[in-house]
Amino acid sequence: MSAAVALAVILAVYVVLRYISSPRGRSKPLNLPPGPRGWPVIGSLGALAGALPPHRALAALAARHGPLMHLRLGSYHAVVASSADTARLVLKVHDLAFADRPRTAAGEVASYGYLGIVHTPYGAYWRMARKLCATELFSARRVDSFERVRAQEMRALARGLFECAGRGAVAVREHVAGATLRNILRMAVGEKWSGCYGSPEGEAFRRTLDEAFAVTGAVSNVGEWVPWLGWLDLQGCVRRMKRLRAQYDRFFEQILDDHDHKKTRRERGRPGAGDSAADDDLVDVLLRLVEEDEDRPETTEASRLTRDGVKAFVQDIVAGGTESSAVTIEWAMSELLRRPDALRAATAELDRVIGHGRWVTERDLPDLPYIDAVVKETMRLHPVGPLLVPHHAREHTVVAGYDVPAGARVLVNVWAIARDPASWPDAPDAFRPERFLNGSSGASVDVRGAHFELLPFGAGRRMCPAHGLAMKLVTAGVANLVHGFAWRLPDGMAPEDVSMEELFGLSTRRKVPLVAVAEPRLPAHLYTNVTPPQQVAGSTIANLSTRPEYKLVF
C-alpha cells in the first residue's frame, strides 16, 4: 500500500470515528477565540510547517484573526496570545490555570521523565524545583560566586579572537558559543569537565547539544500533536531523542561519579586539587540536596530529588544557558554591524566609562546604559524562544470572554508582541537601542517579566529561573566584544548585505552564521596576560592570569 493510500485510509477512519463519537447536542458549544479553520486530523499544523518560521506564521494569522487566537493543532486545542494585553491575561491574571506543561516526548525522554526544570508538570516536584532554583542554583549569591569564572572565560574568548587577528574574518558564533559552553560547564560541572571542550569527547557533546535543540524544537513532529499516530514515530524524532539521551547520559554519569569521588576524598581527609568547598559547582550543590532529601523522612516521593533529577537539571542548565546566551550575542553583533552608528555609540560609551587600560567587568554594567539598551533591543527583535515553552491549561478558563478548554496548549508569541505597533509605535521592526534610553518611550521597560510588551524570559510562575545569570552573560559578552575589538564586515560586504534569516528550533538562531573581521583595539597585554594583572578599583576580579590557556576548536 502506498503512503498516499495509507494516509487516505487513516483520514477516512478518523473522520468516521469523529462523526460517530461527536457529542452532538449533548454539550454547550464552546465560545472559542477566533481563528482559522483547520484540516481533518492535522488541523492548522500545515500552516506551521511551511516556509515561514512558526512564530512568523502565527503572527500573520493573528493579524487576521486577533490577538487571542484559537487553532486546532492536531488533536489539541491551541490558544495563542499575540499582544501585551493577552499575554498579561495568560501569564499573570490566569497564571495558575496555565502553569502546567504539556506532556511531550522531549519531557519524557530527554528530561528523564519530566525531572528537569523546563518540562516539569505543575505540582509538588515543580514546586521543589522552583524553590531549588530560587534559593540554591540561581540566587544572587550563587550567581555572584561564579563572577570570577565568567571573567576568566571572557578573557579567554578575547584571547582566542586576538590570535585570529590578521587572518581575515571569523565566524562569530563559533567563538562565542565555545566560550559560553565552557563558562556554563565550569559553573555547572566544574573546571575539570569544562576542560574537555575541544577534545573529541567535548566535540561530540557539543554536537549532541546542537542536535538535541533541533529535534526537540521540531514543530512538525506529528506524534506530538496527533498522539494516536505517535507510536509510528513517523519522523524518527523519538528514536533520535533516545539515542541522544544515551549519549549525554554517559557523559553525565561520569561527571556525577567524579563528584562522588571528590566527596569521598573530602570525608577521608585527603582532598585533591579542586576538592575544596570554594571549588564547588552546581552538581556539588545538587548532590548535597539529594543526600539531604534521603535523610529527610518528610520528603515525599513526588518531590524527591534523585540522581536522574540531577542529570535532568544539569542538562537543562547546560543546554539552555549555552544556546540562549550565544545566540543572543550573535544577533546583537549582527544588528550592530548593520547599524554602524549604533556600533560607534556603543564603543564611545565604553571608551568613556572604561577607557583603554582594562576590560569590562560585571560591576561596570550598571554604568553602561547604551550597552544595556543594545541587549534589550536585541532580545526584543530576536527572542531566543519566540513562542516561549508551551503552557498547558490545567482547567477550563474564560479569557477575555472566550473559552479556553482544559488540556489546551497555550502559546505566547513574544516575537509578535515585541513587534506590535500598539506597544512599539516607533518603527517596531527597526533596531533602535535608543528607544530604551532615559527620556524615551521604552526607558522603564525591563525584561524580567513585569512588562508584557517585552518577554524574552516569559513571566509568572514558569518564567525562566536563570534570567539574572543570562543577562550577566549576554550583557558582559556584548560589552567586551565591542570594547576589545573594532568590528567590520568582510571587504565588499555592505551592512544591508547581512542576512537576518532565522533557523527555527527550540531556539531561533541565525540561518547564516555571522562572519566579521575583529581588529584588537586595546593594549596587547590585555589579550595575552603577559604582564601581571592589576587589581581594578571597585572590582573583586583580580589575577585573571590563573586561568589555563585554551584554544577554541570547532
Curated annotation (Swiss-Prot):
Gene3D superfamilies given in the database record:
Cytochrome P450
**Annotated positions binding heme:** C464
- Mention one GO molecular function: 4,8,12-trimethyltrideca-1,3,7,11-tetraene synthase activity
Bilayer-spanning residue ranges? 1-21
Q: Does the keyword Membrane apply?
A: yes
Query: Which keywords belong to this entry?
Result: Heme, Iron, Membrane, Metal-binding, Monooxygenase, Oxidoreductase, Transmembrane, Transmembrane helix
Mind telling me which CDD domains this protein's record contains? Answer: CYP71_clan (cd20618)
What is the induction note for this entry? Strongly induced in response to herbivory-mediated wounding.
Q: Coiled-coil stretches, from where to where? A: none
Q: Which reaction does it catalyse?
A: (6E,10E)-geranyllinalool + reduced [NADPH--hemoprotein reductase] + O2 = (3E,7E)-4,8,12-trimethyltrideca 1,3,7,11-tetraene + but-3-en-2-one + oxidized [NADPH--hemoprotein reductase] + 2 H2O + H(+)
Q: In which pathway does it act?
A: Secondary metabolite biosynthesis; terpenoid biosynthesis
Which InterPro entries has this protein been placed in?
Cyt_P450, Cyt_P450_CS, Cyt_P450_E_grp-I, Cyt_P450_sf
In the bilayer, the protein is annotated as: Single-pass membrane protein
Q: What cofactor is this protein dependent on?
A: heme
One GO term under biological process is: response to herbivore
Per its database record, what is this protein's job? Component of the volatile terpenes biosynthesis pathways. Converts mainly geranyllinalool to trimethyltridecatetraene (TMTT).
Q: Which family does it belong to?
A: Belongs to the cytochrome P450 family.
User: What is the protein's given name?
Assistant: Trimethyltridecatetraene synthase
Which organism is this protein's natural source?
Zea mays
